[in-house]
From Swiss-Prot:
Name recorded for this polypeptide: Lipocalin-1
Organism: Homo sapiens (Human)
Subunit structure: Predominantly monomer. May form homodimer. Interacts with LMBR1L; this interaction mediates the endocytosis of LCN1.
A Pfam family the protein falls into: Lipocalin
Lineage, highest ranks first: Eukaryota, Metazoa, Chordata, Craniata, Vertebrata
Primary location recorded for the protein, binned into one broad class: secreted
Gene name of this polypeptide: LCN1
Record key words, sorted: Disulfide bond, Secreted, Sensory transduction, Signal, Taste, Transport
Length: 176
């Protein structure tokens, strides 16, 4: 279950396309703090994973430019805390995680205070790709969602299966 959560959580890192640019090192310094998962899509179905809600995600800039991401998700009635260290590479906006098994990209959105996260990795021996939209404010932003859909589509991911998770300040199993 942890590799599945890591793969999906690392989908927090954005889609590459011509009109989306990787975030610069200076911009990455500004990503520390609280972020809200606004939308996500992956290229595979995970029937065993019923994402019910998410808490705000915390990103922390570590020494050497690495990032730590922490989020708690209510999945199939159970709170799952996910914590990952994203290791900086020589390419701005590009990170690796889980011993290099996952490659993550932070891409700036055209909408202020929003980023699109894209991740490629492997889960149960099969390749998996995911895209997430995060923003500083929990309210949905249609312009940011349109930007996200374009980025997901440009990477070959379905825009028909976009999930917009319910926001929750804390994880409480059994709450609605």
């Amino acid at each position: 279950m942890k590799p599945l959560l890591l793969a999906v959580s690392l989908g927090l890192i954005a889609a590459l396309q011509a009109h989306h640019l990787l975030a610069s090192d200076e911009e990455i310094q500004d990503v520390s703090g609280t972020w809200y998962l606004k939308a996500m899509t992956v290229d595979r179905e995970f029937p065993e994973m019923n994402l019910e809600s998410v808490t705000p995600m915390t990103l922390t800039t570590l020494e050497g430019g690495n990032l730590e991401a922490k989020v708690t998700m209510l999945i199939s009635g159970r709170c799952q805390e996910v914590k990952a260290v994203l290791e900086k590479t020589d390419e701005p906006g590009k990170y690796t995680a889980d011993g290099g098994k996952h490659v993550a990209y932070i891409i700036r959105s055209h909408v202020k205070d929003h980023y699109i996260f894209y991740c490629e990795g492997e889960l149960h021996g099969k390749p998996v790709r995911g895209v997430k939209l995060v923003g500083r404010d929990p309210k949905n932003n249609l312009e940011a969602l349109e930007d996200f859909e374009k980025a997901a589509g440009a990477r070959g991911l379905s825009t028909e299966s976009i999930l917009i998770p319910r926001q929750s300040e804390t994880c409480s199993p059994g709450s609605d």
